């Protein structure tokens, strides 16, 4: 189904760039999941080429299995409808064991592979930070930052709007967000929300 045109006897998993650690992580995962004889861990060559491979597959109606991440503008495009594949749940002990093998392969090449463990990538959370002085001097801004939360899908959509529709205009993208979403109203006092809405 995901035939590798360079080796039609195998499928192709479009992976990371070979200089990125995720390329080697994906190689180990392919081996751990028993797919080493069935799929190649394909290096698309660059981040732009990875995006083009995904967008091209969707444009042509062709199947693709690939590594990717969010948030990105590509994932916000309405024509891109990716499904995250299920892997064993993230487990730190397993991940640490796998990373020992990943680092050996990075140092000594693919022949350094040895059976270990594999599971899904850990979802990362962003941490909001401010200096103590700034926080003490700007309680209203800190209250806003504490209340501010936005879903990954909305960030994807806004990034796509920024790249594809606003011409790279951050202010236009912010206005588009404010005009088309309402969750921001809970981040500010009601009178501030009313003033913002009246100015849109």
Where are these regions (language model features)?
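An extracytoplasmic/periplasmic, membrane-proximal ligand-sensing/linker region
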Residues: 23-37, 47-61, 140, 144-200
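Short, solvent-exposed loop/turn segments at the edges of secondary structure
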Residues: 8, 123-124
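Extended, charge-rich low-complexity interaction segments
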Residues: 71-80, 115, 124, 154, ...
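Ligand-binding pocket segment of bilobal, Venus flytrap-like solute-binding proteins
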Residues: 12-98
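Extracytoplasmic/periplasmic, Sec-exported soluble proteins
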Residues: 14-18, 42-49, 118-120, 133, ...
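A bilobed periplasmic-binding-protein/Venus flytrap-type ligand-binding module shared by bacterial periplasmic
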Residues: 124-137, 160-161
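A conserved helix-loop-strand patch within extracytoplasmic ligand-binding domains
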Residues: 1-16
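Short beta-strand->loop
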Residues: 77-120, 133
